Curated annotation (Swiss-Prot):
Positions bound to ATP: G169, D170, R171, Q172, T173, G174, K175, T176
Gene3D superfamilies, alphabetized: 2.40.30.20, ATP synthase alpha/beta chain, C-terminal domain, P-loop containing nucleotide triphosphate hydrolases
Assembly, per entry: F-type ATPases have 2 components, CF(1) - the catalytic core - and CF(0) - the membrane proton channel. CF(1) has five subunits: alpha(3), beta(3), gamma(1), delta(1), epsilon(1). CF(0) has three main subunits: a(1), b(2) and c(9-12). The alpha and beta chains form an alternating ring which encloses part of the gamma chain. CF(1) is attached to CF(0) by a central stalk formed by the gamma and epsilon chains, while a peripheral stalk is formed by the delta and b chains.
Main location: membrane
Membrane protein topology class: Peripheral membrane protein
Name of the protein: ATP synthase subunit alpha
NCBIfam families in the record: atpA, PRK13343.1
Record-linked PROSITE patterns: ATPASE_ALPHA_BETA (PS00152)
The gene coding this protein: atpA
Annotated compartments: Cell inner membrane
EC number: 7.1.2.2
Keywords of the record: ATP synthesis, ATP-binding, Cell inner membrane, Cell membrane, CF(1), Hydrogen ion transport, Ion transport, Membrane, Nucleotide-binding, Translocase, Transport
Function: Produces ATP from ADP in the presence of a proton gradient across the membrane. The alpha chain is a regulatory subunit.
């Protein structure tokens, strides 16, 4: 048999050319035990804390406990298909999510995978979920209003861009409704406002019923607010690690806007459930429990999340991320562990009370206990001019109302105070899904503090408000425009507003 050397070398060259260069070298470990969403893995000696690892079948996990003889991994998904002895691979990547404008209008899970059936998300950028918050130098103090469209909040407990304002209350007191109204209120700016004013919204649902999240998305869609919103959902049926991760994932998505000179608003609904899922993970990882069986670093869990909401300085693009975390209390107990923690981290809180809710005062904001630590620097001058007196009058009203229950013969001044207070309380009521523009709120509150409601029966206050706003939109749009552009009530505007109120009050009675 005749063997030609040239032929052999050609065959060898061909073989070498087609030799697979994509041999994959990865560090692997073995599952020692698995259960309750936690896997103990032997090996993975060089794994990093917070690194993503991969189980057979493409299930992902995150290395949290790095011990001398094994690694504690939390599993993002079902642990049913993972068995003892399975091989676990390092991915080399810290947990990250897709970010960018491509996510707007979509519903994603805590890892950024779409769950709304609208096809894949073609995001080109990814960001780590757990990054350090901006330091002191890149920040700027909060000075621009973040309008929620709710009179009770924008007038008395103003929220600024870059602030963290806690929404706290028992179940069924309208906490999510406040977030929803704040989202819907951004529609007017998105439709015809300047680019620099637009506020992109991120809603993080933690441990809620799927039906509740679906309802939230439906309302946003019907009212045209989904196009500038991102929904991150880790529902009650998702494993605890997903519920723990969702707020961080949503925050990373919001930070993209903050770091690119845009503005974002993120609502965490709610952080009590995130703390519960973190407690579950920590106890299963055998970390020592502390107060109420929460781990020692549950304060750090929330502080490092909420510190990422910030107003950046001009060198950094002047973007902002505003956070509205929600905490659900049990039986109005705000002195429990998680509520006190989050109250101490945030820049103020909006207290919602069951009693007020059932009295028909909605939004059920307790004006006495709620504060905003940013205060009037997050209001336009026009709002400061009218809302300055309303807070004092309401405080006096609450004090007097307590005394007035005992005495029947009240002097005229007290009677006047009680009358005014009852009407102002009525004025701050607002139906859901009907946020008001700032200039409309200013006009309405102006009527309240200048005595135009004092002669009306309390039941007619709402009707007067609706009528007056319709009148202003048709007849006095120049007044509203003046308040919007000047951001203050000049003497000229004040005269016109008073004249408009006088003429409307005559026709109303």
């Amino acid at each position: 048999m005749d063997i030609r050397a040239a032929e052999i070398s050609a065959i060898l060259k061909d073989q070498i050319k087609n030799f697979g260069k994509e041999a994959e070298v990865s560090e692997v470990g073995q599952v020692l035990s698995v259960g309750d969403g936690i896997a103990r893995v032997y090996g993975l000696d060089n794994v990093q804390a917070g690194e993503m690892v991969e189980f057979p079948g493409g299930i992902r996990g995150m290395a949290l406990n790095l011990e001398s003889d094994n690694v504690g991994v939390v599993i993002f998904g079902s642990d049913r298909d993972i068995k003892e002895g399975d091989t676990v691979k390092r991915t080399g990547a810290i947990v990250d999510v897709p970010v960018g404008p491509e996510l707007l209008g979509r519903v994603v899970d805590a890892l950024g995978n779409p769950i709304d059936g609208k096809g894949p998300i073609n995001a080109t950028r990814r960001s780590r979920v757990d990054v350090k918050a901006p330091g002191i130098i890149p920040r700027k103090s909060v000075h621009e209003p973040m309008s929620t469209g709710l009179k009770a909040i924008d007038a008395l407990i103003p929220v600024g861009r870059g602030q963290r304002e806690l929404v706290i209350g028992d179940r069924q007191t309208g906490k999510t409704a406040i977030l929803l109204d704040a989202f819907l209120n951004q529609k007017a700016i998105h439709d015809n406002g300047p680019e620099g004013e637009k506020l992109y919204c991120v809603y993080v649902a933690v441990g809620q019923k799927r039906s509740t999240v679906a309802q939230f998305v439906k309302v946003l869609e019907e009212r045209g607010a989904l196009k500038y919103s991102i929904i991150v959902a880790a529902t009650a049926s998702d494993p605890a690690p997903m519920q723990f991760l969702a707020p961080f994932a949503g925050c990373a998505m919001g930070e993209y806007f903050r770091d690119n000179g845009m503005h974002a608003l993120i609502g965490y609904d709610d952080l009590s459930k995130q703390a519960v899922s973190y407690r579950q993970m920590s106890l299963l990882l055998r970390r020592p429990p502390g107060r109420e069986a929460y781990p020692g670093d549950v304060f750090y869990l929330h502080s490092r999340l909420l510190e990422r909401a910030a107003k950046m300085n001009d060198d950094k693009g002047a973007g902002s991320l505003t956070a509205l975390p929600v905490i659900e209390t049990q039986g109005n107990d705000v002195s429990a562990f998680i509520p006190t923690n989050v109250i101490s981290i945030t820049d103020g809180q909006i207290f919602l009370e069951t009693d007020l809710f059932y009295q028909g005062i909605r939004p059920a904001v307790n004006v006495g206990l709620s504060v905003s630590r940013v205060g009037s620097s997050a209001q336009i001058k026009a709002m400061k001019q009218v809302a300055g007196s309303i807070k004092g009058e309401l405080a006096q009203y609450r004090e007097m109302a307590a005394f007035a229950q005992f005495g029947s013969d009240l002097d005229a001044a007290t009677q006047r105070l009680l009358n005014r207070g009852a009407r102002l309380t009525e004025l701050l009521k607002q139906p859901q899904f009907s946020p008001l523009k700032t200039e409309e709120q200013v006009a309405v509150i102006f009527a309240g503090v200048n005595g135009y409601l004092d002669k009306l029966p309390v039941a007619s206050v709402g009707k007067f408000e609706q009528g007056f706003l319709s009148y202003l939109r048709s007849e006095g749009s120049a007044i509203l425009d003046a308040i919007r552009t000047e951001k203050a009530i000049s003497d000229d505007t004040k005269g016109k507003l008073t004249a408009a109120l006088d003429s409307f009050a005559k026709s109303f009675s």
